[in-house]
Curated annotation (Swiss-Prot):
The gene is secA. Keywords: ATP-binding, Chloroplast, Membrane, Nucleotide-binding, Plastid, Protein transport, Thylakoid, Translocase, Translocation, Transport. It comes from the Eukaryota. Has a central role in coupling the hydrolysis of ATP to the transfer of proteins across the thylakoid membrane. GO terms for biological process: intracellular protein transmembrane transport; protein import; protein targeting. This is Protein translocase subunit SecA. Belongs to the SecA family. It comes from Cyanidioschyzon merolae (strain NIES-3377 / 10D).
Length: 774
């Protein structure tokens, strides 16, 4: 890499002398050469071009470490780069190089705000060099999506990408398909998408006729059942295990013989009710908004509008809360992020925290993690954890620490794990008269997320935020001049393009008043930044160790960006979830036996905390690995069905498919022919008769009817199959208690279900075709 870096730096000097049109011409030449040469051979010239483009358009000079990061991305690896090291610019180099093939590049971000920001900001460099860029958001129309995927570089969120993939495989005509074949993808915050969200499948569902009654009945039974007597809980995996007494109690209450029957799966309803009772807590896992249960993302703390828990769990929570129970949805299509991103021939990622999960990235995705050194030396001090015996004493200590810092004027960012806890701290600070900004999933607060986080580095700023809220937005010591200028310009002009006004200011092309305001803000910012640095920079307080050291490191990483001063400390208690579930009881015993005063700092406790956290990390890794193993079974079936469906959709003539399906499921009974008389000529004759009938009405009608009925039958049977696979997955775990390997059982039974589905598709299609009337 050092040799390549030296070549790029030497070559870049030539590019300084080139005119804008000459840089664009370079892009055209490189595109032509990409047809014959490898991207590795084009890298030196491509990266030199982007470097010069960024210097001219954004006034940004790339650092050596950014160029190294870009080389890592081009290799199809993960570049671990700390907060504030300029990952967005790094992606510009690798995306430009890989776009030269003409096959398209996707840059995937965690939210629409970041996708729009990067396409507008970094995308300007790519457009300057002659590439086409596009952004696809939640609001994009089908036409905009289609055009967006045709661009050289497309900025998009992981969920939009996944749902477009699923919708394309439910399309009824070629014109409805928006995506082209996947080529190269760079995932920003790759750990958030490929690890934190790996357990949550993307689901497209449709309403199904169902009754509210089973959920209400199951809730009434579930809330009266007793833990330990009727059921046991596996808190780590959020699983419910019904005991013999509990099963009998359910069967008596419901007056059924077997609650595990596939025909009347009452066990499914009751276990969901018990899960809703114990594991899904209001203002932690969800909020009630306008009479609806709305999910709160456990990793980002944001509400997930439009998303619902699958398999009847959402309805169970609605029954618990006494709100309107919405119709249970029928899964029409689904895919996990694990399998979605494995569809790319070449995949890369960026994040500030990946090294702790490098085994998982390597094992599941085949992605190597490469740590990129920081441009400036890290100055942040990470202090040892302070441990309290009770949660109450911990929160009092956090509030006191915030008050102490607020009095000094030092900015503080406090990370909490839920809405409930963020509001608890807010109340404690109010009692002390400490001013703060609160950021959590409540809609009234979430709207200002980016601006609140951007100004969290100002003097006297106390910001309480759930989990990873504001990730992707830099916290600049002394505040963010751009945000402050944006607020001022909005007050001055009602209809204003802030990005355009900001660009004019940077280029010295703004009006006199704007130039004057910018100068004033810059002077104020420099003074404030100096003062904040003297106070020690941003102080990050963690209020709970997370299930992964990586998430703790993300919170710490909000401080000390680009060599800034800063510090972090975690305040934790033995009542926190991590310690309670994975070993807090043992430490509580030791502390009470030793009669230790609160609070406590010790090497022994820190090691115990690390051990507990590693245990959790390994536990969840094994869960994700198991999910991946099970999902591979469904994934191979999905690939087969989607290939068949796509081939039918894209084919000009579908007659051969039609005949193939009919031969295997000849519905002779419909024509008064005995089953035993089936032969090839009968099939051909009957098919030709049907075709003549249809063609006599309209030329090409038979072909379109066949296509429609084939797609219809595939979709109907696939949706039914997904439901059966979901039930099988839920009940198969019980085989483990009978000393049988659940995964082997799942593979065997899912194969039988798949064969049954194929037969249903053929049979259903054959009958539909011969029953159809012109």
């Amino acid at each position: 890499m050092k040799n390549k870096l030296r070549q790029i730096k030497e070559n870049r000097e030539k590019y300084r002398k080139l005119k804008e049109e000459e840089l664009r011409e370079k892009t055209k030449q490189l595109k032509e050469r990409a047809k014959q040469e490898s991207l590795e051979e084009l890298m030196v010239e491509a990266y030199s071009n982007v470097w010069e483009g960024a210097a001219r358009v954004l006034k940004l000079e790339a650092y050596d470490v950014q160029l190294i990061g870009a080389m890592v991305l081009n290799k199809g690896q993960i570049a671990e780069m700390k907060t504030g090291e300029g990952k967005s610019l790094v992606a510009a180099f690798a995306s430009y190089l890989n776009a030269l093939s003409g096959k398209g590049v996707h840059i995937v971000t965690v939210n629409d705000y970041l996708a729009k920001r990067d396409e507008r900001w970094i995308g300007e460099v790519l457009r300057y060099l002659g590439l086409k860029t596009a952004v696809i958001t939640n609001e994009s129309s089908r036409e905009e999506r289609k055009k967006g995927y045709e661009a050289d570089v497309t900025y998009i969120t992981n969920s939009e990408l996944g749902f477009d993939y699923l919708r394309d495989h439910m399309a009824w005509s070629k014109e409805e398909i928006v995506q082209r074949e996947f080529n190269y993808c760079i995932i920003d915050e790759v750990d958030s998408i490929l690890i934190d969200e790996a357990r949550t499948p993307l689901i497209i569902s449709g309403p199904t006729k169902g009754s509210e009654k089973p959920y209400k009945v199951a809730w009434e039974i579930g809330k009266r059942m007793k833990e330990g007597e009727d059921y046991e809980l596996e808190e780590k995996s959020k699983q419910v295990i019904l005991k013999e007494k509990g099963i009998k109690r359910c069967e008596e209450a419901l007056e059924v013989k077997d609650i595990f029957s596939m025909e009347t799966p009452w066990a499914h309803y009751v276990m969901n009710a018990i899960k809703a009772k114990h594991f899904y807590i209001k203002d932690v896992n969800y909020i009630i908004k306008e009479g609806e249960v709305v999910i709160v993302d456990e990793f980002t703390g944001r509400i997930m509008g439009g998303r619902r828990w699958a398999d009847g769990l959402h309805q169970a929570i609605e029954a618990k809360e006494g709100v309107k129970i919405q119709e249970e949805s029928e899964t029409l299509a689904s895919i996990t992020y694990q399998n979605l991103f494995l569809l790319y021939p070449k995949l890369a990622g960026m994040t500030g925290t990946a090294k702790t999960e490098e085994e998982e990235f390597e094992q599941i995705y085949g992605l190597k993690v490469v740590s990129i050194p920081t441009h400036r030396k890290m100055k942040r001090k990470d202090y040892p954890d302070v441990v309290y015996r009770t949660s109450r004493s911990k929160w009092m200590a956090v509030a006191e620490e915030c008050e102490r810092m607020w009095t000094k004027g030092r900015p503080v960012l406090v990370g909490t794990t839920s809405i409930e806890k963020s509001e608890l701290l807010a109340r404690l600070l109010e009692e002390k008269g400490v001013k703060y900004k609160l950021l959590n999933a409540r809609p009234s607060l979430a709207a200002d997320e980016a601006s609140i986080i951007a100004q969290a580095g100002k003097i006297g700023s106390i910001t309480i935020a759930t989990n990873m809220a504001g990730r992707g937005t830099d916290i600049i010591l002394g505040g963010n001049i751009k945000e402050a200028f944006g607020e001022w310009i909005k007050e001055r002009k009602k209809q204003v393009d802030i990005e355009e006004e900001w660009r004019k200011v940077l280029e010295g092309k703004a009006d006199e008043e704007s130039e004057k305001k910018y100068k004033q803000l810059k002077e104020e910012h420099e003074k404030e930044q100096k003062r904040v640095k003297q106070l020690g920079g941003l102080y990050v307080i963690g209020t709970e160790r997370h299930e992964s050291r990586r998430i703790d490191n993300q919170l710490r990483g909000r401080s000390g960006r680009q060599g800034d001063e800063g510090s972090s400390r975690f305040f934790i208690s033995l009542e926190d979830d991590l310690l309670r579930i994975f070993g807090g009881g043992q430490m509580g015993e030791i502390m009470s036996r030793l009669g230790v005063e609160e609070p406590l700092e010790s090497a022994f406790l820190s090691k115990s905390l690390d051990r507990a956290q590693k245990k959790v990390e390994n536990y969840y890794y094994q869960m994700r690995k198991q999910l991946f193993e099970y999902d591979q079974v469904l994934n191979s079936q999905r690939k087969a069905i989607y290939k068949e469906r796509t081939d039918i959709l894209r084919s000009e003539e579908v007659g051969e498919w039609s005949k193939s399906y009919i031969r295997k499921e000849w519905p002779g009974g419909l024509l008064g022919i005995k089953r035993g008389m089936r032969n090839r000529s009968e099939v051909e004759i009957s098919y030709d008769v049907k075709k003549m009938q249809m063609e006599s009405v309209q030329a090409g009608l038979m072909n379109e009817l066949e296509r429609l009925l084939l797609l219809q039958q595939i979709d109907k049977s696939w949706s039914k199959h997904l439901k059966e696979m979901s039930l099988l997955r839920e009940f198969i775990a019980w085989r483990g208690y009978a000393q049988r390997d659940p995964l082997v059982e799942y593979k065997n039974e899912s194969y039988n279900l798949f064969i049954k589905m194929i037969e249903e598709i053929r049979q259903g299609y054959a009958y539909s075709l011969f029953r159809s009337q012109a």
